[in-house]
């Protein structure tokens, strides 16, 4: 039964440990998933900031006057919005799954209720709070996505909002530097919030570590106290074992004494049977004497005096017979008491040497009684001889009667002595009964003490087994807690390292982003200046071209007035030559203008390509970090 109980206990412990490990695994998985979703939401928020910054530049797109670069930018904006929307949907699905997992784990923890219930419940509360925060972020991103979709709808349909709203937007529109500053501040706020969350987690880990250290200290104290209690109980168990061994030795000695008493009682029973046979012989002899006395009465009836004497003698003989009967009854009672003694002695388990001495004295007294009976038999024989002698001689009757009276008196004295001896035997039997009763009580007390000692030893053994099992369980729990503490320390080290690494990466990426934003702004300003200078040059060239054409037209008119009277063939030749000169002059101007416009287009395309590539690289880098 004890082995079965132990097996059930160890199975329950193993099942409890497995449940705790499963709960911890689920909690770690939930924490990892929540961290993944929060990181992904941060990256999506950064992408949303970039899209909002683009939204301010996409006001004039979708019109007929817009260039293909603006259409390309609108397409990239649309693609990025679609990617952001799909990612937000995916994050929303992940949050639904996480919420279901949190509900499931909370139900399992409430059904189990093991030792780490408070810690696990706190971790679940933290994960639920982070899930609520991520839900709020998702809702904000969806609202801003709806605004971006509205702008895309206006761009696709080629319509814009009311002019008043456009004027208000232009009036209250933020500058690019303000937007950059605002985005940088938002990024810094998010990074500070993440650092605060990490510091909170570090504080929680430190508190958990302190609690685990306190638990380890308490378990070590409990194990030391249990070891002291087990040592004390083991000493008590050894004392009980020694006392049980002493009691077993005493019981063995008492059993040996009982066997000796049984042998002595068997000998006394044999002697009693011999005495019974002798008493029967005495009764037979007394009957024969009664017959002789009757014959003597017939002979003594002749003489009155002799008859009176014989009557007295008869009375004396009757009294002697009664005394003998009383002695027989006493002997029978003694036999019955001895039989009862035998029955009690069969149930007894202890004896004493004083009982042996009393039995030996009783045997000696029985032998003395046998000797007295022999003397009585001899006296009876003498009486019969004297009676026969009285028949022969009447003169000597008086003397013989006197002698007979003396002998009867002696017999009465002997009978009294036998009574006294029988009373002494009864007293000895009573003493024997009392001694036997005392021995029986001692045996019962010893039995009760032995049973109590056995029960105590059994309880001590059970307590030792329970203590050993609890000690082994405590050792296992201590080893498990130590391993857990080591793993938590390793996790803390990893978390610190990851925190430092993420902080370094964040700082480096912030620097890179700021540098890239500065480069983009400088390039944008340079390109705008180039466009402005090119536009001025274009205007100057157009003005020069117009002035040249007007001057040429005026000179040709003067020549015509001067040479009005010239021949028609000469005028046509001059006109053709002038047209050829204008064509030769306009061709290099057109080529220079077309080359400048192509360079401008190439610069704009390169700018858009660089911006798209930069956004794509940033997008890939952030999603690479999340994954």
From Swiss-Prot:
Presence of the UniProt keyword Transcription in the record: no
Coiled-coil parts of chain: 81-152, 188-218, 312-542
Localization: Membrane
GO molecular function: myosin XI tail binding
Keywords: Coiled coil, Membrane, Transmembrane, Transmembrane helix
GO terms, biological process: regulation of establishment or maintenance of cell polarity regulating cell shape
GO CC field: membrane
Membrane topology: Single-pass membrane protein
Region (Disordered): 577-597
Purpose: Together with WIT1, required for the nuclear envelope docking of RANGAP proteins in root tips. Plays a role in nuclear shape determination. As component of the SUN-WIP-WIT2-KAKU1 complex, mediates the transfer of cytoplasmic forces to the nuclear envelope (NE), leading to nuclear shape changes.
Assembly, per entry: Component of Ran complexes at least composed of WIT1 or WIT2, RANGAP1 or RANGAP2, and WIP1 or WIP2 or WIP3. Interacts with KAKU1. Core component of the LINC complex which is composed of inner nuclear membrane SUN domain-containing proteins coupled to outer nuclear membrane WIP and WIT proteins. The LINC complex also involves nucleoskeletal proteins CRWN/LINC and possibly KAKU4 and the cytoskeletal myosin KAKU1. Interacts with WIP1, WIP2 and WIP3.
Protein name: WPP domain-interacting tail-anchored protein 2
Organism: Arabidopsis thaliana
């Amino acid at each position: 039964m004890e082995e079965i109980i132990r097996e059930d206990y160890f199975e329950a412990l193993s099942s409890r440990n497995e449940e705790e490990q499963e709960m911890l695994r689920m909690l770690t998985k939930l924490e990892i998933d929540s961290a993944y979703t929060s990181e992904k939401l941060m990256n999506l928020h950064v992408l949303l900031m970039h899209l909002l910054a683009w939204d301010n530049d996409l006001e004039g797109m979708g019109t007929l006057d817009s260039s293909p670069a603006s259409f390309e930018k609108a397409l990239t904006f649309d693609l990025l919005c679609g990617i952001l929307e799909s990612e937000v949907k995916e994050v929303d699905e992940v949050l639904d799954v996480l919420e279901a997992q949190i509900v499931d784990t909370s139900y399992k923890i409430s059904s189990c209720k093991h030792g780490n219930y408070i810690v696990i419940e706190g971790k679940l509360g933290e994960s639920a709070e982070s899930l609520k925060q991520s839900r709020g972020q998702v809702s904000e991103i969806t609202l801003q996505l709806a605004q971006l979709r509205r702008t895309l709808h206006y761009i696709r349909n080629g319509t814009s909002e009311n002019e008043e709203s456009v004027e208000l937007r232009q009036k209250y529109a933020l500058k690019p530097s303000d937007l950059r500053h605002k985005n940088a501040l938002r990024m810094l706020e998010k990074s500070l919030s993440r650092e605060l969350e990490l510091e909170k987690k570090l504080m929680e880990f430190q508190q958990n570590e302190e609690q685990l250290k306190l638990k380890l200290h308490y378990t070590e104290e409990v194990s030391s106290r249990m070891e002291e209690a087990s040592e004390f109980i083991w000493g008590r168990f050894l004392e009980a074992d020694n006392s049980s061994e002493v009691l077993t030795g005493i019981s063995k000695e008492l059993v040996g004494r009982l066997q000796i008493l049984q042998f002595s009682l068997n000998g006394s029973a044999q002697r009693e049977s011999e005495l019974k046979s002798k008493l029967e012989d005495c009764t037979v002899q007394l009957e024969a004497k009664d017959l002789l006395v009757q014959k003597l009465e017939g002979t003594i009836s002749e003489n009155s005096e002799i008859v009176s004497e014989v009557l007295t003698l008869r009375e004396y003989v009757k009294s002697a017979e009664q005394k003998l009967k009383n002695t027989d009854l006493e002997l029978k009672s003694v036999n019955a008491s001895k039989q009862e003694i035998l029955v009690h002695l069969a149930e007894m388990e202890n004896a004493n040497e004083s009982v042996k001495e009393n039995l030996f004295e009783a045997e000696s007294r029985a032998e003395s009684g046998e000797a007295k009976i022999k003397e009585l038999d001899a006296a009876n024989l003498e009486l019969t001889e004297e009676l026969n002698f009285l028949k022969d001689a009447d003169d000597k009757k008086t003397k013989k009667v006197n002698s007979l009276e003396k002998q009867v008196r002696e017999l009465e004295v002997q009978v009294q002595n036998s009574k006294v001896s029988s009373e002494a035997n009864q007293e000895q039997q009573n003493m024997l009964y009392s001694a036997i009763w005392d021995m029986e009580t001692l045996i019962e007390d010893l039995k009760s003490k032995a049973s109590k000692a056995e029960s105590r030893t059994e309880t001590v053994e059970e307590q030792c087994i329970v203590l050993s099992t609890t000690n082994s369980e405590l050792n296992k729990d201590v080893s498990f807690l130590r391993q857990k503490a080591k793993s938590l320390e390793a996790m803390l080290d990893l978390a610190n390292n990851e925190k430092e690494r993420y902080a370094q990466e964040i700082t480096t990426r912030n620097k890179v982003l700021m540098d890239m934003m500065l480069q983009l702004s400088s390039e944008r300003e340079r390109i705008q200046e180039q466009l402005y200078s090119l536009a001025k040059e274009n205007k100057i060239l157009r003005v020069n071209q117009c002035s040249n054409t007007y001057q040429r037209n005026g000179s040709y008119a003067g020549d015509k007035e001067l040479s009005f009277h010239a021949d028609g063939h000469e005028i046509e030749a001059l006109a053709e030559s002038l047209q050829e000169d204008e064509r030769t002059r306009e061709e290099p101007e057109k080529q220079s203008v077309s080359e400048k416009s192509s360079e401008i287009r190439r610069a704009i395309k390169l700018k858009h390509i660089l911006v798209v590539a930069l956004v794509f690289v940033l997008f890939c880098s952030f999603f690479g970090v999340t994954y």
